[in-house]
Amino acid sequence: MTHFPNMAAQIQYFEDSSVVIWHDAVDGIVYRSADEGKSWAPIKGPEQGQAHLFVLHPYDKTQAYILTRSTQHWRTSNRGETWQSFSTPHPPTTLKAMPLDFHPTHHDWILFTGQACTVNLFRKVCHDVAYYTTDGFISDAHPLLDRVEQCHWAKMTPQVAVPEALTQRVLCLAWDVSMSRKRRDTTQLKMFASDDLFQTRQAVVLEDLPNPRGFVNMGRSDQFLIAAVQSDDDELRLYVSRDAETWTRARFPHVVLSHENAYTILEGPKYHLAVDVYDHASRLDGLFISDSTGTNFSLSIADTVRGADGIIDYEHMTHMEGVAIVNVHATGSPARVQTRITHDEGASWTDIPAPTQDLDGKKTSCDRPGCSLPLRAVLAIRNLGHVFPSTAPGIMMGVGSMGDRLRPYGECDTFISTDAGLSWRMVARGPHKHVFADQGGLLVMAADAPSIDVVQYSFDYGTTWTTLALPEAIAPVVITSEPDGTALNSLLQGGRRAKTAHARY
């Protein structure tokens, strides 16, 4: 057991190693463990209080970056064993973009977005500036483009089929030179492409818009690049590209939608796009699945649950082909939330079947029509990572309630499925945090309660559980394990009341 002064903002694992990182964002300290969390020590590099952001390289298992609020930062290329400092012309952006963007095949090609500010007598005015490095900041970063909203390598994922000749292409949302000194006007925001790190640039042309402006955002999903544009009539249009050259407008069925107002791109089937669309005119919130081109969509399921921040109560099962779970408002009763599951990439959805027996082996009363097993999903997440985080195909675990609606979290129980959600059984009364280790061979759970002094683990997919006593009672916060789920160890982070702080374990 190790004591920390504050809860971790991040617990990150270096893939294929025993190295774990604990980022205390309150005190600005990064701790490192080389033995899967058994022992910890502050890293040697940044002074205490400097570690503002910790960023793992998504494509290089050995690289990570620590960004401060100033212009001196730190990098490692050996999983945090040693750190080297580097400088940038400006502090990291705090506006919209993420400060670092990584190339998936050239791991030392990195874009950095910084924030340049001027101060006059009345206010501080800031704008974002993009820089690039092709050697992982061993040498100074070079200017890319001034007054940007965001910049990305066009090959945003390994799956995006950018031609070899365009490997160095960068896409930026930015303003025309004529607009660069004026007030930030997002209606004039354009997308620019450059194949020579913005020595030259050209405005991106869309399928039905030769001179598009009003870009709202851009991003990616597996093999697709996506851009959203606000049209002159206030309609939000979605455009899709698979090669960073040709952009085609996404088409949704007009018999369902009259005016698309908000898009949420979801992690979905491998060769399709999953997009939740909110249409203000019809008050429809629905999940749409594309064909293999990513441009022609059909309604998969309506009345999806959307949070105030636009997050959809949906999760795609990464290691189970075609399987996803979504929460929806019950027909005719929006206050009732129910859960649906698909096993065919959204072509059809069904209720989740409730267990026939409770924890004591007694028959449940949920054998009547309309009675199912609604589950808590993303909007009620009380742990790090996926809500159903199994790297073992077929195994799912979640918190829910039996009945015709999802009950409040404190009234829910904990359930498991070992056949990709076709059948479920109760494994604990009350909500529990849980994690999978050893590729599903080890399950660990802890009651989500104000104070616990035990955890439970199972080596037989939840059929039997062994109780493990904790050295002292804690309030559990997070239980996590190595992302690939192969390790036998898991970490439980919790707290106890102290005079000045919480102790974390």
Regions found by a protein language model. Give the residues of each.
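Extracellular glycan-interacting surfaces
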Residues: 1-505
